[in-house]
UniProtKB/Swiss-Prot annotation:
Keywords: Kinase, Nucleotide-binding, Serine/threonine-protein kinase, Transferase
EC numbers for this chain: 2.7.11.33, 2.7.4.28
NCBIfam families, alphabetized: PRK05339.1 (NF003742)
Family annotation (HAMAP family): PSRP (MF_01062)
Protein name (Swiss-Prot/TrEMBL): Putative phosphoenolpyruvate synthase regulatory protein
Protein purpose: Bifunctional serine/threonine kinase and phosphorylase involved in the regulation of the phosphoenolpyruvate synthase (PEPS) by catalyzing its phosphorylation/dephosphorylation.
Catalytic activity: [pyruvate, water dikinase] + ADP = [pyruvate, water dikinase]-phosphate + AMP + H(+); [pyruvate, water dikinase]-phosphate + phosphate + H(+) = [pyruvate, water dikinase] + diphosphate
Top-rank EC class of the record's enzyme: transferase
Matches recorded under InterPro entries: Kinase-pyrophosphorylase, PSRP
PANTHER family (UniProt xref): PYRUVATE, PHOSPHATE DIKINASE REGULATORY PROTEIN 1, CHLOROPLASTIC (PTHR31756:SF3)
Lineage of the organism: Bacteria, Pseudomonadati, Pseudomonadota, Gammaproteobacteria, Enterobacterales
Length: 277
């Protein structure tokens, strides 16, 4: 497709708009366009809905191109206002609900905030996720080696290879208690698996990264330092990868993967239960 154009994309919801964003991004990623995203959560009353409609219309007037609108709104009167806008509107939930309704012979009972809201039925799961986040923060970057037996996975790797963001994503998105342990330059002269980790080898997962990418990341943090030199990065990566092989620790090269992809691959390789919240 040759005609690549910029498009304004709205993600609108009477809740958090997370569902609209996730599904909308998935759809838009199929097209070679540069988008300008506008997320508008908690559109719960007619006054706010009219303000949103005016915002959509204003962009259409300025650009002459219809904004794309992905929405998830329960109240019909709010939906009606959004549908009066100059945007190309897509109800992302109803597109799936309608055929399911026909297949299951059941009428849906839509309730605002059901997907990401708190209710008596999901309070225990929510508390477990918060506990996982607290645990992960307390065990980031080898801060604490206490209660490591409570971790569901322990990520290993050199500095700046993606351990912390991956650990936090596992905790926040899936409620996984993820600890992580760094191997630093001082470890490299005699790199061995720490004694505290040996009994937990079944929970260990190694991250590695291309030295060139690692050097570029470190250069942003400590410019022109030994820490960021390509020679140092090559040495550290080689030593850590040798450690993984020696101890038969499953590992993944994070260079070309997003945090979401890394986390999902870890869940799959380690056989951890995938729980969505």
């Amino acid at each position: 497709m040759d005609n690549v154009v910029d498009r304004h994309v709205f993600y609108i919801s009477d809740g958090t708009a997370i569902t609209a964003e996730v599904l909308g991004h998935a759809v838009m990623s199929q097209f070679p366009v540069t988008i300008s995203s506008i997320t508008l959560p908690f559109v719960e009353n007619e006054s706010r809905a009219r303000a949103v409609k005016d915002q959509i219309d204003a962009i259409y007037q300025q650009t002459g191109v219809r904004p794309l609108v992905f929405y998830s709104i329960v109240l019909p009167e709010i939906r009606a206002i959004i549908l009066q806008s100059e945007g190309f509107c897509q109800d992302i939930v109803q597109a799936l609900v309608a055929p399911l309704q026909q297949e299951m012979k059941l009428d849906p009972t839509p309730i605002a905030h059901r997907t990401h809201g708190l209710n008596p039925g999901n309070l225990n799961k929510y508390d477990a996720r918060i506990a996982a986040i607290d645990y992960t923060l307390a065990h980031d970057d080898g801060i604490s080696l206490r209660n490591l037996d409570q971790a569901q996975v322990i990520l290993l790797g050199v500095s700046r290879c993606g351990k912390t963001p991956t650990s936090l994503y596992l905790a926040m998105q899936f409620g996984i208690r993820a600890a992580n342990y760094p191997f630093i330059a001082d470890d490299m002269d005699n790199l061995v698996l720490p004694t505290s980790l040996k009994p937990l080898q079944h929970k260990l997962f190694g991250l590695t990264i291309d030295p060139e990418r690692l050097a570029a990341i470190r250069e942003e943090r400590r410019e022109n330092s030994r820490y960021a030199s390509l020679r140092q990065c090559r040495m550290e990566v080689a030593e850590v990868e040798a450690l993984y092989r020696k101890n038969q620790i499953p590992c993944l090269n994070s260079t070309n993967y997003s945090v979401e992809e890394i986390a999902t691959k870890i869940l799959d390789i380690m056989g951890l239960n995938r729980r969505m919240y």
